[in-house]
């Protein structure tokens, strides 16, 4: 005898007040991830996933759009306060932080967590154009 089909339970979104926005700004792309204090991802967006391709991915405007998309998606969790961790040398660093600020979040701190080598790996050779 077949079991009756179990009704799918509606997933309840938990409410989170404080979160961390991780902005990874490389020379080619910008990735914005918003997590809770424990590091569980609530939302994320990238410049490439926001419709920008090629060299337009690495622009500050593309980083702004990606941060706005991640910020709007995280608002569903009731997020109010953000700490911002910025990593990387890319051109979208400041514009992504400004976009999160314009989404209505109260930004408590901005921290630069760019990894700096203590004479580690050899850097790539210089470009000859």
Curated annotation (Swiss-Prot):
This protein's name: Small ribosomal subunit protein uS11
Subunit organization: Part of the 30S ribosomal subunit. Interacts with proteins S7 and S18. Binds to IF-3.
Gene that this polypeptide is encoded by: rpsK
Species for this entry: Pseudomonas putida (strain ATCC 47054 / DSM 6125 / CFBP 8728 / NCIMB 11950 / KT2440)
Keywords associated with the record: Ribonucleoprotein, Ribosomal protein, RNA-binding, rRNA-binding
Domain of life of the native organism: Bacteria
Stored InterPro entries: Ribosomal_uS11, Ribosomal_uS11_bac-type, Ribosomal_uS11_CS, Ribosomal_uS11_sf
Entry's Gene Ontology cellular component terms: ribonucleoprotein complex; ribosome
Homology family: Belongs to the universal ribosomal protein uS11 family.
